[in-house]
């Protein structure tokens, strides 16, 4: 639900320790897919490694519905809460 999604978006900022880069990419990409939909920007340039990684993670979800992305995002944040605590 939208409320669960918004709550998860707040809770992910309150984790006691920093998730791995890959975990954060998963969370970021599902957030973007849930809020924006399919990638709507050009892939960042060669030297923007972080930007490219984020874009690629988001682009990998192309075609996923916003609702499915929202559910997956909430599930991923729940998983991180269990692992890192809030």
Swiss-Prot record:
State where it is primarily located: endoplasmic reticulum
* Residue span, ACB domain: 1-86
Q: Which GO terms describe its biological process?
A: fatty acid metabolic process
Tell me which residues bind an acyl-CoA: 13, 28-32, 50, 54, 73
The organism's place on the tree of life at top rank = Eukaryota
Q: Which gene encodes it?
A: DBI
A Pfam family of the record is ACBP
Gene Ontology terms for molecular function: fatty-acyl-CoA binding
The record describes the protein's role as: Binds medium- and long-chain acyl-CoA esters with very high affinity and may function as an intracellular carrier of acyl-CoA esters.
- Cellular location of this protein? Endoplasmic reticulum; Golgi apparatus
Name the family.
Belongs to the ACBP family.
InterPro entries for the chain: Acyl-CoA-binding_prot_CS, Acyl-CoA-binding_protein, Acyl-CoA-binding_sf, FERM/acyl-CoA-bd_prot_sf
Please state what the protein is called.
Acyl-CoA-binding protein
Q: Which UniProt keywords apply?
A: Endoplasmic reticulum, Golgi apparatus, Lipid-binding, Transport
Question: Gene Ontology cellular component?
Answer: endoplasmic reticulum; Golgi apparatus
């Amino acid at each position: 639900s939208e409320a669960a999604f918004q709550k998860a978006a707040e809770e992910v900022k309150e984790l006691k320790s920093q998730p791995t880069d890959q975990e954060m990419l998963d969370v970021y990409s599902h957030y973007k897919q849930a809020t924006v939909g399919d990638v709507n920007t050009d892939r960042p340039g060669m030297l923007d490694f972080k930007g490219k990684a984020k874009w690629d993670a988001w682009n990998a979800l192309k075609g996923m519905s916003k609702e499915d992305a929202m559910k997956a995002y909430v599930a991923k944040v729940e998983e991180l809460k269990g692992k890192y605590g809030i």
